[in-house]
């Protein structure tokens, strides 16, 4: 009796063990929780279904197609294609894809939506040249960090740079991919015969940006070497080595930290050429952000006054690391803020980074000056400057002026202080200062206590700051003569 009972218990244990060792329940994995289709009718999106058994799908809604409609055990790629463009101003919900997992007797819904064919805003970051390529790649990496499911939202973020050589350029889009949960680089086009110093090539890049990413509004960032209004070398010797010029003008001192001032000689545009390019485009950029040195120069900005609405720029050198793109990109696509607020936040983020976080990047310095120019106010500023030029003069020492470039040849002096020191008519000087406030609002003038210059290799104190420079006080040739040929000087004297 005892033996029979033991045998029955053993059999029960064996049956229980067998039950525990039965095949596990079939599993299915779907790589996305939602599908976001491009706004036009030519793109597509894809996701993968990985399953232990057969599955099928159905979909409801309109404006898209799905293939294939079923799969077996293993991994299957499913492609979702829009069948028409989204002509609305915002995303539209197209429908739902439902995955039917027969073995598991479960259904999985995936919502499908489509971006607008015309983006709310397209921003192009144009970074020509090769000398700063390491920093350009770091800038792109920072943008990738900023791109999420919400940023740029229904906007488009494009980049054009020269990762291979001076004779080629590549344009790509940085876009969030729901299937991977990361920012992806989408190649748009390659330019095989490209010269950043050739106006027609640059114009083509800007035109293509609108063709590949049409938008209601456009923004432009130019990140490269900058020398304000100083004429480009255009393939000839730079001015710093021409006979009769001061040899140190564009030569950094030994051991200087890298800034965005020097390099890529022979691949430069004059500011007048850039203005002509922008004026000729079939689109208009609302703003231009210069991630370049010295571009907050009145001689420079006056040439651009009818080409864009706003310019963000620095009166001094910008460290080679450039703007903190992970911090400014969210503001560029902030649909809840007006444009002036967005641009103020860009200025503030630039200053904050160089004021407090500059040492998070090797080879950096606590040096960041920035301002916002309201371009529609520059003609009125020129009119006030004509009154200054005609008014009584008062003597001052040029050494009193706040300058923004190291070395023996300073070149760039604070415009507001120059007028305050040189104008002998208090009423005229006050009227000029009032117009300066409209053209360069105080609330968008930011600076660190000092600025770094590679031309003397050190930090230089800032005691007076209006956010914009002039080269009129410069006496060194040929710059003194060249300055008198600028449109700003001719309009104000």
Label each PLM-derived region with a short phrase.
Residues 129-132, 163-167, 193-194, 224-230, ...:
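Solvent-exposed loop/turn segments at secondary-structure junctions
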Residues 77-94:
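Extracellular/luminal low-complexity segments enriched in Ser/Thr/Pro
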Residues 162-188, 222-265:
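Surface-exposed loop and adjacent secondary-structure segments within mature catalytic domains
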Residues 116-215:
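N-terminal extension/subdomain marker
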Residues 25-30, 50-77:
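Surface-exposed binding patches on compact interaction domains or structured appendages
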Residues 90-104:
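A short beta-strand micro-motif common to beta-rich folds, especially ectodomain repeats
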Residues 2, 12-37, 65, 102-118:
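Bacterial Sec-dependent N-terminal signal peptides
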Residues 246-493:
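Terminal, contiguous helix-loop blocks that mediate binding/assembly
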